[in-house]
From Swiss-Prot:
Listed cofactors: FAD
HAMAP family, alphabetized: TrmFO
Localization per Swiss-Prot or TrEMBL: Cytoplasm
Lineage: Bacteria, Pseudomonadati, Pseudomonadota, Alphaproteobacteria, Hyphomicrobiales
Pfam families: GIDA (PF01134)
EC number: 2.1.1.74
Enzyme class: transferase
Biological role stated in the UniProt entry: Catalyzes the folate-dependent formation of 5-methyl-uridine at position 54 (M-5-U54) in all tRNAs.
GO terms for cellular component: cytosol
Record protein name field: Methylenetetrahydrofolate--tRNA-(uracil-5-)-methyltransferase TrmFO
Similarity-based family: Belongs to the MnmG family. TrmFO subfamily.
Catalyzed reaction equations: uridine(54) in tRNA + (6R)-5,10-methylene-5,6,7,8-tetrahydrofolate + NADH + H(+) = 5-methyluridine(54) in tRNA + (6S)-5,6,7,8-tetrahydrofolate + NAD(+); uridine(54) in tRNA + (6R)-5,10-methylene-5,6,7,8-tetrahydrofolate + NADPH + H(+) = 5-methyluridine(54) in tRNA + (6S)-5,6,7,8-tetrahydrofolate + NADP(+)
GO molecular function: flavin adenine dinucleotide binding; tRNA (uracil(54)-C5)-methyltransferase activity, 5,10-methylenetetrahydrofolate-dependent
One GO process term, biological-process aspect: tRNA methylation
């Protein structure tokens, strides 16, 4: 079911202001205008550019030109594509119209894509585009505002948001550790236990997964970390210093062979129930990353190793030999909110509800994810402007699962360590489990191995699209196109 444009309605007298003409801001603007709401879109380029942007086009793709897999049945980002298409996404329309050959992926001509988005927004009668920088919090008389300024948010606006919230509200380095699917961890080697069996708020005393190493395994691991191929910083990232709490694990290893086992891999306060008489030389800990307990992050393992090196090196860890990664690690300059603390379910800032946030600044990672959250923010702001109520997308959908991660799906840290919320790509680990996972194929044969995993993903996708259609009919009340 593809959603047709809603019937024409009187435009709201008070426009909604959108700050930032990237993927999220452009999509939010489009959704507002489609609903009959006047929009003023503020984009600071070309008057003020960033280190990464090269043009003044809206929705410029500053890195890759890929929107990743377009397989809605078997891939979470492909499912997100499908959901956004059903909701009349401008970003997906422009991507489809400017597609370039890329196998099963959706890749685009970046200039054609940006030009298509810019043209659609510039020609819409309810959209005004102002080329100006908003160097602080928007004026009160603007009313409802969507802030979608992205990972390169200007310093003035970032400081204004920080002052309105608190000192820990913004991070300027993405400290991304790898995330592993729980069911791919070998529990004949790993075990659950918190250090010294400490039970923190909401914890049980067995909140971490532990993977032990002996001396030989540890030394080989350190050597592999140091020798692994690294990803270089982009030119515009090189002047941003490391924060002590965000050092890449390979940088810690380079500072001394014992650094890691006195840091994130320290073996103290833990006893291996599989081999209780043998003390591990070092221990890798994984911490639950989502409320569903389907994803675990590798504590302290933020890294600049390239993806191939990460998979090779991290699968040498006992218990992770067959690890499936929902996300690999990284460290790059970014600006994002501690969204579960600061935003409500409608993406409104709790300290100032007239302000909504959208896109990468909220803690989603990736082009499509940013545009998807912009879409939800635009729909929500349109409902407010038109005096309607709108529920959030169901958590069983890709949009709802991503929104759930941003506004409440993370786990607070158990100890006194740094907060656990970090940016995330869409993946099936964010979705609630199926009430009944498929066990047999269409031919009646019992599913095993990869076939079982494929059937599970397909069932999650089918459920998501059915639930999205029901939500559209009940919450948005928009007519469906034939």
């Amino acid at each position: 079911m593809i959603i047709a444009a809603p019937p024409p309605q009187p435009a709201s007298n008070q426009p909604v202001h959108v700050i930032g003409g990237g993927l999220a801001g452009s999509e939010a603007t489009w959704q507002l205008a489609r609903a009959g709401v006047r929009v003023v879109l503020h984009e600071m380029r070309p008057h003020r550019s960033t280190e990464a942007h090269k043009t003044d086009g809206l929705a410029e793709l500053v890195c890759s030109n890929s929107f990743r897999s377009d397989d809605a049945a078997n891939n979470a980002v492909g499912l997100l594509h499908a959901e956004m298409r059903r909701l009349g996404s401008l970003v997906m329309r422009a991507a489809d119209a400017n597609q370039v050959p890329a196998g099963g992926a959706l890749a685009v001509d970046r200039d054609g894509f940006s030009a298509a988005v810019t043209k659609a927004l510039a020609e819409h009668p309810l959209i005004e585009i102002r080329r100006e920088e908003i160097a602080g919090l928007p004026p009160e008389d603007w009313g409802n505002v969507i802030v979608a300024t992205g990972p390169l948010t200007s310093a003035a606006l970032a400081e204004a948001v920080r002052a309105l919230t608190d000192e820990s509200a913004l991070a300027f380095f993405d400290a991304i550790a790898p995330i592993v699917h729980r069911d791919s961890i070998d529990m004949s080697i790993a075990w659950f236990q918190s250090r010294y069996d400490k039970a923190g708020p909401g914890g049980s005393g067995a909140d971490y997964l532990n993977c032990p190493m002996n001396r030989e395994q540890y030394d080989a691991f350190v050597d592999a970390l140091i020798a692994g191929d690294k990803v270089d910083f982009k030119d515009w990232e090189k002047d941003t210093p490391y924060f002590d709490g965000c050092l890449p694990i390979e940088v810690m290893a380079e500072r001394g062979r014992e650094t890691l086992r006195h840091g994130p891999m320290k073996p103290v306060g833990l006893t291996n129930p599989h081999n209780p008489t043998v003390k591990a030389y070092a221990i890798v800990q994984l911490r639950q990353d989502n409320k569903l307990g389907t994803l675990f992050n590798m504590v302290g393992f933020q890294t600049k190793l390239n993806y191939a090196a990460q998979q090779r090196v991290f699968r040498t860890i006992p218990g992770l030999e067959n690890a499936e990664f929902a996300r690999l690690g990284g460290l790059h300059r970014n600006t994002f909110l501690n969204s579960p603390k600061l935003l409500d379910a409608g993406l409104r800032l709790r300290a100032a509800p007239r302000l909504r946030f959208a896109g990468q600044m909220t803690g989603c990672e990736g082009y499509v994810e940013s545009a998807g959250i912009g879409l939800v923010a635009g729909l929500s702001a349109a409902a407010d402007a038109l005096g309607r109520s709108m529920t959030t997308p169901p958590p069983t959908t890709a949009l709802g699962a991503l929104l759930g991660h941003i506004t409440g799906g993370h786990i607070e840290t158990i100890d006194a360590g740094p907060r656990s919320f970090q940016p995330m790509n869409i993946n099936f680990g964010l979705f609630p489990p199926l009430a009944q996972a498929p066990t047999h194929g269409p031919d009646g044969k019992k599913l095993r191995g990869p076939e079982k995993s494929v059937a599970k993903k397909q069932a999650l996708s089918a459920r998501a699209l059915a639930d999205l259609d029901a939500w559209i009919a009940a919450s948005l009340k928009l007519p469906a196109a034939a």
